[in-house]
Amino acid sequence: MFKFHQVKHIFEILDKMRCLRKRFTVSFLGVLVIFLLFMNLYIEDSYVLEGDKQLVRETSIHQLNPERYVHTFKYLSNFSGTINVTYRYLAVMPFQRKRFLTIGLSSVRRKKGNYLLETIKSIFEQSSYEELKEISVVVHLADFNSSWREVMVQDITQKFAHHIIAGRLMVIHAPEEYYPVLNGLKRNYNDPEDRVRFRSKQNVDYAFLLNFCANISDYYVMLEDDVRCSKNFLTAIKKVITSLQGTYWVTLEFSKLGYIGKLYHSHDLPRLAHFLLMFYQEMPCDWLLTHFRGLLAQKNVIRFKPSLFQHMGYYSSYKGTENKLKDDDFEEELIDLPDNPPASLYTNMSVFENYDASKAYSSVDGYFWGKPPSTGDVFVVVFENPVIIKKIKVSTGTEDRQNDILHHGALDVGGYIRYFKQNRQCITYIRLGEFKNGNFEVSDVNQKIPFDVHCMRIHVTKTQKEWLIIRSISIWTS
């Protein structure tokens, strides 16, 4: 059995080698490999056997003590992208493989309250065993106060040691020497000098965090250090990304508050980091993120409901002022999210302004709005690949415009695609039912039709004088 005193002996040897930096780095990494091999006897990926949790915590704290073992590892893989920053690894095991999603948090000392540990806890507790295999969490302790950082590292390693050892949690710090000038900056928007310094440093904090995370995963989501997560938020994000295959996007938004829940392709992170660093003193971070999205030619916001992340902090990191902002679209328990497979949408109805057909599909924040439809008008969803459908739900009208519903209509599904004027169309349809009070819902579709579905069609069966809002089209597949 692997004894704790053996681990202690290893670290005593390491301590004697501190003066030989380059040799220490090689030796340290070698010991980590041995350490991980031993720990694999007791750790099954993410879950630690109860009898060994205390051992894991103690060895991790000893190993990652900031005063003794925080060093700059220049010889590790270069995660820093194109911005020349040498990070300090405060709590880290090497990431063993590229993952699907990195969750980035930047945290500084607050005058009142501390929500970082609760945020990390929420990320892990709201993820399933399978989801944990696909995420990495990077925490940037961005405060220049080393005593505060030491306390936070010890708290994090005590509570989340098994996640650190499993390679899914990393705590880093970008040294103050890499920061640009933070005092005497121009006071845009008549902000007081201390607020200008706070938001300017925050931009740099996030720039260095983004820069570090560029090669860790396929996607990156930005959170604050006082956030609560929805159950299985990763699965929801995956469904959204899948539904947008073939669609150009820069930023997807899973909360309507500030920069919480902003999702990016990881390949965009280096230039986003440069962008924040270039304009760090101009405006707050969330404003810069909006400009970045526009510069990369995503004109409209793509935001999804329900929101997956909720602000939970009561005291702001700026001066400890009260911050009661809440996202009223947040749902902690996501119930039966639709799959909405990739598709093209067409309609011959007259579209009002920019309320186009695509806004009715999936949970994008928005809806289709058309002028009064006539008998025979259609709204068609053509799937990129044939699908086996379990359930369909279509909702029309809104709370504000309850009469802008489909008063007379039916829903059909079709197979047997043909090409007509560069568009794909189905040549045969089967009717599944009629709309009732502006809504349509049907289950067990795969048991009602004898073919895989290529198209779904909303068919207007009687002219109406009211305009039509199609609020949402939700499809569940087998």
UniProtKB/Swiss-Prot annotation:
In short, the EC number is 2.4.1.145
Enzyme class per UniProt: transferase
GO cellular component annotations of the record = Golgi membrane
* Intervals, Lumenal compartment: 45-478
* An annotated GO BP: protein N-linked glycosylation
Q: Where are the transmembrane segments?
A: 24-44
Membrane topology, as annotated, equals: Single-pass type II membrane protein
Pathway terms, separated by semicolons? Protein modification; protein glycosylation
Pfam families in alphabetical order = MGAT4_cons (PF04666), MGAT4A_C (PF23524)
Which reaction equations make up its catalytic activity?
Answer: N(4)-{beta-D-GlcNAc-(1->2)-alpha-D-Man-(1->3)-[beta-D-GlcNAc-(1->2)-alpha-D-Man-(1->6)]-beta-D-Man-(1->4)-beta-D-GlcNAc-(1->4)-beta-D-GlcNAc}-L-asparaginyl-[protein] + UDP-N-acetyl-alpha-D-glucosamine = N(4)-{beta-D-GlcNAc-(1->2)-[beta-D-GlcNAc-(1->4)]-alpha-D-Man-(1->3)-[beta-D-GlcNAc-(1->2)-alpha-D-Man-(1->6)]-beta-D-Man-(1->4)-beta-D-GlcNAc-(1->4)-beta-D-GlcNAc}-L-asparaginyl-[protein] + UDP + H(+)
Kindly list the cofactors needed: a divalent metal cation
Function, as annotated: Glycosyltransferase that participates in the transfer of N-acetylglucosamine (GlcNAc) to the core mannose residues of N-linked glycans. Catalyzes the formation of the GlcNAcbeta1-4 branch on the GlcNAcbeta1-2Manalpha1-3 arm of the core structure of N-linked glycans. Essential for the production of tri- and tetra-antennary N-linked sugar chains. Does not catalyze the transfer of GlcNAc to the Manalpha1-6 arm to form GlcNAcBeta1-4Manalpha1-6 linkage ('GnT-VI' activity).
Q: What name does this protein carry?
A: Alpha-1,3-mannosyl-glycoprotein 4-beta-N-acetylglucosaminyltransferase C
Q: Which organism is it from?
A: Sus scrofa
The gene name reads: MGAT4C
